[in-house]
Amino acid sequence: MKAILLAGGQGRRLRSITGKLPKPLVPLVGVPVLDRLLDLLRRSGFTDVCATLCYRPETIQEHCGDGSSYGVHLRYRIETEPRGTAGAVRACSDFYGQDDFLVISGDAACSFDLLRLYRQHQSSGAAVTVALYPDAEPLQYGLVLQDRQGYVRHFIEKPDWPHVVTDLVNTGIYIISPRAMTYVPEDTPFDFANDLFPLLLAANEPILGVPMDGYWCDIGTPRAYYRCCLDVLDGRLSPVPPEAPESPDAPAPCTDPLRRSVPCRDRAHRMRTLSEAMMEAGADFTNGLHVHDGSWELTVRPDAEVSALQVEANTPDAAAETARLLELMEQHGK
């Protein structure tokens, strides 16, 4: 089965965490989001994969190669300018041809049963099937209103609280029949939720919504990223995929997720952190370091064999705190 993986994101809101990494390579407790997604695709039977790239495409190409180390066949489409989600997929028409295919975002952690989603789509005759997920804070997502048969009647994009009538959000994971893509113009920025789906509804093309079990989290903000990292440590997402290639930019994995002191056998040269049990390859704090600033407490202790990082955070709102933490660490290194 075929899948298109949208991996062109830059991750501006995560810049204090990602640096120059494309957002799909952001690590979740030592494993890039993209590695986890490719492992999920393989386990779900989607072994023919096309990734759409835009920001620093060579970084992802070097990291993933031809996909053989993940058990998939991986090819790429590179955008010189962003085309929107639907526009990027339309540019892959030679890849999907006349086959139904999966679309999945490269910057969300997920454990859905994608094969079940695919089978429900094929049995329904829908033009598009949308994976839905309940979210207690749905304001930043698109809400989906369905009829009793599960077909979509309305999309409400990023509502305010008075307009929240459901907690089911659009995850950006779709099964699409090729006829739906004929509504997308070529070489024109075009989005699924804002552009294509209203056209399909106006044309009476059926869109099926399927509430999914499992785990899903869009890591687009520091707060969501922090929450997702803790969810991984709590076992809500599957463990590190086996045989995933190691990235030189990825953080050293924690062998004991219950520990807040994370050892790394090679002394780091630069270091960034957001939450407990995470350390990115980085700085050499040879003499040790202790920082206590507001809700953050950080300790880097000197050791003959290892360097360690300990972080305690009393709040999940990490944007300003991460920047402050990095500033303190840089001052110490001067």
Residue ranges, per PLM feature:
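N-terminal glycine-rich phosphate-binding loop and ensuing alpha1 helix
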Residues: 1-61
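Structural beta-sheet core signal
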Residues: 5, 51, 103, 128-131, ...
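Short acidic-glycine loop/turn motifs at beta-strand connectors
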Residues: 146-149, 302-304
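Conserved beta-loop-beta/alpha segment of the NTase-like Rossmann-fold superfamily
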Residues: 60-62, 67-148
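Catalytic-core segments of class I nucleotidyltransferases/pyrophosphorylases
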Residues: 100-102, 109, 115-122, 135-138, ...
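Phosphate-binding and adjacent anionic-ligand microenvironments
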Residues: 243-334
